[in-house]
Amino acid sequence: MGRNHDGRSTNWRISSDRFIGREPQLERIAVGLQGAADGRPNALVLSATAGLGLSRLLAETRDRIASLAEPFASVHGVARPATSGVPYAPITSALEDLLAPLPDETLAALVGPTGDALARLVPGIKPRLAELELLPARPRIAAAEWREARMFEAVLGLLERLGERQPVALMIEDLHHADAATRGLVTFLARVTRGQRVMLLVTYQPDRLLRSDPLRATLSALSSSPTVGTGEISPLERQELVQLIESIEGGRPSSTTLLLVAERSRGNALMAEELLAARRELQGVSVSGSFARLVTTRAGLRSPECRRVLRLLSLAGSTVSMSTLLAMAAEFEARSSARPRRLATGIRQAEGLDEDIAVGVTEAIEHGFLSETIARPRYEAGAAAGGILAAGGTLAGAPNGRVPRERGDRENPARDARGRTGGRRADRGDRSGSDPGRSSYLQHRGAVQLPVSDIQFGFRHELIAEALAADLLPATRRRYHAALAAAYDTEADPQPAAAMAHHLAAQELAEA
């Protein structure tokens, strides 16, 4: 459900809750998954311009993997601008999500003899590795090139041991934002074939690459391997646009609407969604502007609370927790000479900074600017977290646990992945997958079972963040960067530390 320009609830959505098109790409992924299940490691590199749906394709792939009769381990990492200088950042986050919830016995079996290298790669599991006596008594000293080689072998060994229990789908999203170490590791994993049951799925945006971009050398190295395939996501066809509009607006589009969306979007799903939202919210206003103009004009209709949240997050460069967002807002307010402008008309929606931010987040989600994700729960003694590899070697628990088929029904990952239909809703980063307006933060902020630190907020698509960030005045940008850096300064994790340096560099080069 959404709301129109005067705040009344409507029955339209911001994004489609159905997965539309992309069958050729899903077919290729399914073949790759079958190859991995049969012990034939392979890789697939997919490219598409921004907004065509690469993130959603990966989310759909994860959904379908989660429903396979034969359990697959799905490992997913995203390279983000704010952590582009952190070595192995997307690999670190992906492996921490995989390893942190595991019981001790399973963790020890997967880590094996590579505890020291994996502890450097995934600092979050280092205390547990020390408790399990998986770290050497003395740190090993080696030259830089040997440290890199050992790191590569440690990751490959981990994937091999994981593959012995179940096939692995390793997905690295937005490689154009990745650091040199991540690019080197991806090349190594794609080209080394030792019978591991692993499929590597990598995505990037070619329109983001400069002529001298180092990723071009990585892509050349990948394409030279016989086990690496490539593919490109094309714009949606007209009939697929019809399905998209039907799913969003709840009915078949008029010829005028279809013509407008088809001509303006040129098959770009994100642009089509923004055009439809603009037509509903900007009544009497031309929707002939650019994507950025549509986004900023829609944002201008929102409350001061919502606009403050959007401005803060537009420069963050990654998803943030509610606690970090509150810290950012407090830092900015402390540095501002004037308090943030309150609502000019109507009843105040909230009292106090925390309530203002909560109201702003909810409104931003409701109008399709932000999406939210729930952090994967950490392992607790006596129970395996949902969707995590259990000691017996299967994916156990909700929401990703699978119920085996009846005996005699042969398991075929490729057939199952192809045969499933779209139309499901999932937690995806490039659309508002949750019920708009029903923020998990507001639903659960008083509940013991879901701390607010477990809820992450980010833009539905990075193009939305870029449009809003570009609309900020230079002096305002510097103040927001300073507030973001100060909020990250209290976090010990290397990725927030890199984000802090990123924001310091944007406004105080000497401190960075």
Give the role of each language-model region.
Residues 33-41, 163:
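Phosphate-binding P-loop
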Residues 1-31, 129-142, 286-292:
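Conserved adenine-nucleotide phosphate-binding loops and their immediately adjacent elements
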Residues 49-84, 89-92:
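P-loop NTPase Walker A phosphate-binding motif
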Residues 89, 120, 194-260, 264, ...:
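Alpha-helical sensor/transducer elements of the RecA-like P-loop NTPase core
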Residues 159-203, 257, 363:
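Conserved Walker B catalytic segment
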Residues 2-8, 89-169, 220-223, 227, ...:
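Conserved Walker-type P-loop NTP-binding/catalytic site
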Residues 9-13, 52, 240-248, 252-512:
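Short secondary-structure boundary elements
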Residues 46:
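Hydrophobic anchor at the beta1->P-loop junction of P-loop NTPases
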